[in-house]
């Protein structure tokens, strides 16, 4: 693939997931959209790291750190969602006021 195609793909993925995050009413779907946003950013890190300086792996290493942080965020987010589901029996964002108290 040429360099122009990959950032367009990443921007397309990013914009779809931003739309999904804004319009999502389910907490699990919002977490999935957030993970895909981070993956779109990782695609750009790896692409530009490979294109501009293929000898140094700064973009690749940074994307590995982002993946590790995203995994921790997913674990914490899913724990919060399961706790809210146990208490409220719903994963809808607009029905959950548990964290406001």
Curated annotation (Swiss-Prot):
Gene Ontology biological process terms in this record: ATP synthesis coupled electron transport; photosynthesis, light reaction
Q: Does the keyword Translocase apply?
A: yes
Instruction: Name the enzyme group at the top EC level.
Output: translocase
Catalytic function, reaction form:
a plastoquinone + NADH + (n+1) H(+)(in) = a plastoquinol + NAD(+) + n H(+)(out); a plastoquinone + NADPH + (n+1) H(+)(in) = a plastoquinol + NADP(+) + n H(+)(out)
Q: Which GO terms describe its molecular function?
A: oxidoreductase activity, acting on NAD(P)H, quinone or similar compound as acceptor; quinone binding
Q: Which UniProt keywords apply?
A: Chloroplast, Membrane, NAD, NADP, Plastid, Plastoquinone, Quinone, Thylakoid, Translocase, Transmembrane, Transmembrane helix, Transport
Q: How does it sit in the membrane?
A: Multi-pass membrane protein
Query: Which residues does UniProt assign to the signal peptide?
Result: none
EC assignment: 7.1.1.-
Subcellular location(s) per record? Plastid, Chloroplast thylakoid membrane
GO annotation, cellular component aspect: chloroplast thylakoid membrane; NADH dehydrogenase complex
Coiled-coil positions: none
Bilayer-crossing residues are 2-22, 32-52, 61-81
Checking Pfam families in the record gives: Oxidored_q2 (PF00420)
What this protein is reported to do is described as: NDH shuttles electrons from NAD(P)H:plastoquinone, via FMN and iron-sulfur (Fe-S) centers, to quinones in the photosynthetic chain and possibly in a chloroplast respiratory chain. The immediate electron acceptor for the enzyme in this species is believed to be plastoquinone. Couples the redox reaction to proton translocation, and thus conserves the redox energy in a proton gradient.
Q: How does it assemble?
A: NDH is composed of at least 16 different subunits, 5 of which are encoded in the nucleus.
Regarding protein family, the annotation reads:
Belongs to the complex I subunit 4L family.
Q: Which PANTHER family match?
A: NADH-UBIQUINONE OXIDOREDUCTASE CHAIN 4L, NADH-UBIQUINONE OXIDOREDUCTASE SUBUNIT ND4L
Protein's UniProt name? NAD(P)H-quinone oxidoreductase subunit 4L, chloroplastic
Supply the source organism for this entry.
Answer: Gossypium barbadense
Q: Which gene encodes it?
A: ndhE
